[in-house]
Amino acid sequence: MRQPHITALLLLPLLLRSGTEGAEAMRACGHPRMFNRMVGGEDALEGEWPWQVSIQRNGAHFCGGSLIAPTWVLTAAHCFSNTSDISIYQVLLGALKLQQPGPHALYVPVKRVKSHPEYQGMASSADVALVELQVPVTFTKYILPVCLPDPSVVFKSGMNCWVTGWGSPSEQDRLPNPRILQKLAVPLIDTPKCNLLYSKDAEADIQLKTIKDDMLCAGFAEGKKDACKGDSGGPLVCLVDQSWVQAGVISWGEGCARRNRPGVYIRVASHYQWIHQIIPELQFQGRAGSQQQQRDPRGWQPLAENSAPCLAAHAVLLALGALMLGIL
């Protein structure tokens, strides 16, 4: 007669896991353990951007991406023109150097790639894709997810954000060995100004590029600093309410670091519904207060609202406790 009691006990960890799995990434997201934010710096530090991943084809880096959950990476759709043979792809996590990833790095094969169905080619809207890993990764201080914003988060023009990647330092050069992860602080540019910049010095025989509603610009009107080839799919992150939140996915640009040609990113929040549809358990970061604040990241603690899933778990405990008392 005690079998239902045993069954309830066996179900308890499963129910708790299902109620808190999405919360695990939310509590861990956007809080790296290493801090060194030097404007104008180039080489990143180990563990400084723990969500940054290298997406590799036949063992060679070709695009960046960001870890958003134990089995999911966010990147650009244009990185995957052909996924007929998924076995050629793998993801490198926890690495600072591509050539010498080190003991904290991890290679994980790709299970599948989901590109946004509305993506229609380079410089078009919806240039986002989700890469599912074959096995879940364990979070460490070198491997952590970034937070994703819901539509309530507003990234204001002029806000300083950071872009990272192993791409080329210029249109002519390749990142020298051992290919250390690069970081760059860039200000956000509003859409009207970005469209104006792209209209300047435009060649008559080239179709004028326009910034769509789901795009975001960041960089400098004078050029000189920008993401480049090999950075595609990587994250543009901003500090919002004490957490690093991914504002954009590196999508396209006209050349690299050219005058009046800032980098163009896909707004993550614009594709909130699509991401949620594929990863329903993933939690998104909303605005904690009426105003966003940029603070010193040292000494961060998980946000209080992240405890909501724990309350749900407690409710499950109470319900199961009552059930077991009834059985006994």
From Swiss-Prot:
One Gene Ontology term, aspect cellular component: extracellular region
GO biological process: proteolysis
Glycosylation sites: 82
Highest taxon above the source species: Eukaryota
Any Pfam family hit: Trypsin
Keywords from the UniProt entry: Disulfide bond, Glycoprotein, Hydrolase, Protease, Secreted, Serine protease, Signal, Zymogen
Leader sequence residues: 1-22
Any one GO MF annotation of this record: serine-type endopeptidase activity
Subcellular location per the Swiss-Prot or TrEMBL entry: Secreted
Positions of the catalytic residues: 78 (charge relay system), 127 (charge relay system), 232 (charge relay system)
Disulphide-bonded residues: 63-79, 161-238, 194-217, 228-256
Major enzyme class: hydrolase
InterPro entries in alphabetical order: Peptidase_S1_PA, Peptidase_S1_PA_chymotrypsin, Peptidase_S1A, Trypsin_dom, TRYPSIN_HIS, TRYPSIN_SER
Enzyme Commission number, as recorded: 3.4.21.-
Propiece residues: 23-37
SMART domains the UniProt entry points to: Tryp_SPc
PANTHER family: SERINE PROTEASE 27, TRANSMEMBRANE PROTEASE SERINE
Record's protein name: Serine protease 27
Record organism: Rattus norvegicus (Rat)
Gene name as annotated: Prss27
